[in-house]
Amino acid sequence: MSQTTERVGADELSTLKLVALDGALDGRVTVTCADLADRLDASNQTASRRLQRLEAAALVERDMTGEGQRIAVTEAGERALQREYADYRRLFEGDADVTLSGVVTSGMGEGRHYISLSGYMRQFRERLGYEPFPGTLNVDLDDGSVRTRARMDALDPVKIDGWEDDERTYGPAFCWPAVLETADGDRYGTAHVIAPERTHHGDDQLEIIAPEKLRETLSLDDGDTLSIHVSE
């Protein structure tokens, strides 16, 4: 779980859920501590403290008005709720697999360099069971998948440890097993989503590794639609 959500507990997350149900995921909504306290079966002071903690954790934004507080759930707050949702799916459905979709795009070539480094390649062979093709398949996620991606935090990744050589240190990375499916229905099952701890990519960009060059194996070009079924 991310550092942000570790700063709040179950009480704050239940409060976050209530304001999200009021519409705070889509924009600012007016919330009064008295009304929130009634719904939480708590005192006004307790409701106020929970909102303050959510704001301090950057899970909500608040503006004070004469009618109460105008509250919006932030992107970090939405990710926290997505993680809660994934946990409940695991509890009641037995798994929390995540399906993402987007379009293939060209990267900047950094993946080829880093994946080929011996400190990473050795761990890929040991922990993933294969030697990846030197390069990543880059996917620009659609808007819905950007929001859904947070559910991956509930999946246990394969950890690739950081390491160092005589020149610099290299950060850790996390890998999740993935099955890829093209718009034509072709599937590829020996792949992993990889997320370096140090990255300039945003949540809308996904990197995938596999033992083969996926563009050739799946006949993919820039702009082609791809579904990614992520598991653990």
Swiss-Prot record:
Residues 1-97 are annotated as: H-T-H motif-like. Residues 98-232 are annotated as: Riboflavin kinase. PANTHER family: RIBOFLAVIN KINASE. It catalyses: riboflavin + CTP = CDP + FMN + H(+). Binds 1 Mg(2+) ion per subunit. Its cofactor is Mg(2+). FMN binds at residues 199, 207. Coiled coil: none annotated. GO terms for molecular function: magnesium ion binding; nucleotide binding; riboflavin kinase activity. Pathway: Cofactor biosynthesis; FMN biosynthesis; FMN from riboflavin (CTP route): step 1/1. It holds the Pfam family HTH_20. Mg(2+) binds at residues 136, 138. One of its GO terms (biological process) is FMN biosynthetic process. Keywords: Flavoprotein, FMN, Kinase, Magnesium, Metal-binding, Nucleotide-binding, Transferase. Belongs to the archaeal riboflavin kinase family. InterPro entries: ArsR-like_HTH, RibK_CTP-dep, Riboflavin_kinase_archaeal, Riboflavin_kinase_CTP-dep, Riboflavin_kinase_dom_sf, WH-like_DNA-bd_sf, WH_DNA-bd_sf. It comes from Natronomonas pharaonis (strain ATCC 35678 / DSM 2160 / CIP 103997 / JCM 8858 / NBRC 14720 / NCIMB 2260 / Gabara) (Halobacterium pharaonis). This is Riboflavin kinase.
